[in-house]
Amino acid sequence: MKDSAPAIGIIGGSGLYQVEQLRDTTEHKIDTPFGPPSDALIGGNLSGRQVYFLPRHGRGHRILPQELNHRANIYALRSLNVRWIIAVTAVGSLQEKYKPRDILLPSQFYDRGSLRAGHTFFGEGIVAHVSFAEPISLQLRNLLAESAKKVGLTVHNGGTYVSMDGPAFSTRAESELNRRHGFDVVGMTNVPEAKLAREAEIALATMAMITDYDCWKVEEEPVSAQTVFGHLTANAEAAKKVLVEAIPRIPAEPDWAEHRSLDNALVTERKLWPEGTIKKLGPILGRFSGR
């Protein structure tokens, strides 16, 4: 769908399984070379912009963080000409000042995960190394911060998201160590999404919706699924308010640095690219392969 208008993607995290504000909706069941995405994508119009929504864990919350097919999810969005992604996610706070139901917009990631298979589109004859020093789109992050403030929400612009495997929550030792390192929130899903979005030349920002204090705060009950889900409805409604405010403010044309992230990343000479890999990565390599 490279001839379609540049679109905006929303990845919904725990508690955010639909966006009722989308109009003229259509369902898209997409098969990718990496397997199926988490669920059908819902396309629709929001304030005159084409938007595609994907529930990260599937409708009904059926998929563990470790079971997510991140490549299929990002590939499916890119095949629909998505050039911006707002990734909404539930996180635990590692700092007193970040409270449940606050929003934190990370500026950095620290990857403590060990399950990195499938965190790149490349290989099979084509080598690429994207720059990831600044893993979040600054323009999109600032736009989300301004939008959250405008609708009256408590938002923190910047901070470090530390990623863990899960599905179990942190031990107290892990939580305290993360705090001592100066990390701000902890989650299980966003690092691979950000890496793959960068490879797909999509500008991504994470909207981290705080549900708990992890387990470092000994005077409170440690995080549990019940704790998290107790805040999800309120956080989902807050996220929708931000999305409705932010999406009309995203530029119509993709001309940010993230939209050219492969310019200096591709290492393998074009003449050596295997035909099968070119075909497989069509939506990602289209502007280099002429397809």
Predicted region positions:
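Non-catalytic positions within long, well-ordered alpha-helices that form the structural scaffold/packing
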Residues: 78-81, 179, 198
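His/Asp/Glu-rich mid-to-C-terminal helical/loop segments that flank catalytic regions of hydrolases
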Residues: 215-263
